[in-house]
């Protein structure tokens, strides 16, 4: 919004050219989202408390968590407000990637809001059924996947439609340009051509998978928000590089016109996330809820797909991956041993993984900070792939 205004008025006021610089707008988006979160936080927490949307704690979880029962949840709306305002103020609203990321983020946020609402109203920690949740996630994820398959490959929406029609006329067998290939970290001239169907399948898996992985990780005060901020900031760097014809050529990445604008979104997400951490740090005054976790995970997955860094997201989001795998392994092993031996056995003391460490004697704050440190190291490793190729 402010970019369009600056472009319109810069002939009358030369200082407004500052607003056309992507890095300046990214910094301002971070500050805007941070200030909005810090200022609106007490009001949002107070309203959530008045609405009596307290968190229902799992009875089979760690006993130390029982004191958290009744803490306001659905605080993810505070993050989404900060992201929305900062992105709309400082982003280029003609950029197609901004809108598709916003669509996925807020679409998944609505799913999470319904899930949280059911948990609060019916006092049931399970919320929406898994089938219902995955159905709506799949609807949004598949829509985004189909659009991005052609959007990443072309420079504007007109050419996106032309490419889509060419694919239809080919009998759904036409391939995609090289910039839509799966990029392999550390290899500068080797990529894997996915084709339209492969791109759609991978994108769906990344978006929906990232959303649920972040949601599973959100189990301790402050645990998930800092990794989201770190991974989001790192993806913002990739977006800046991929969106620049100069830097992408120098670093041997495919140039994706318009991708650089995602730096604004990632910056807004970082600022909003830090503001939320102010109130979510131990002992938490508010919980993110599914409305925040599902939305942020979907956002990370979508940005990673656009900048063609799905594998790097897997690396930098290693904590999310480990948490998800711990649940999958626990459930699979329990069912297998129950069928084979008549008694279910566990690999971990409790899943997701952060509960295993809690029951192993780690304090909650130790688990949280150590997971932050691991994520920081993984993000630095992921960023190293910019040059080590």
From Swiss-Prot:
Q: What does the record give as its pathway? A: Cell wall biogenesis; peptidoglycan biosynthesis
Write one Pfam family the protein is assigned to: Glycos_transf_4
Q: Where in the cell is it found?
A: Cell inner membrane
Is Membrane there in the keyword field?
A: yes
In alphabetical order, the GO MF annotations are: metal ion binding; phospho-N-acetylmuramoyl-pentapeptide-transferase activity; UDP-N-acetylmuramoyl-L-alanyl-D-glutamyl-meso-2,6-diaminopimelyl-D-alanyl-D-alanine:undecaprenyl-phosphate transferase activity
InterPro entries documented for this protein: Glycosyl_transferase_4 (IPR000715), PNAcMuramoyl-5peptid_Trfase (IPR003524), PNAcMuramoyl-5peptid_Trfase_CS (IPR018480)
* Keywords from the UniProt entry: Cell cycle, Cell division, Cell inner membrane, Cell membrane, Cell shape, Cell wall biogenesis/degradation, Magnesium, Membrane, Metal-binding, Peptidoglycan synthesis, Transferase, Transmembrane, Transmembrane helix
PANTHER family the UniProt entry points to: PHOSPHO-N-ACETYLMURAMOYL-PENTAPEPTIDE-TRANSFERASE, PHOSPHO-N-ACETYLMURAMOYL-PENTAPEPTIDE-TRANSFERASE HOMOLOG
Q: What is this protein called?
A: Phospho-N-acetylmuramoyl-pentapeptide-transferase
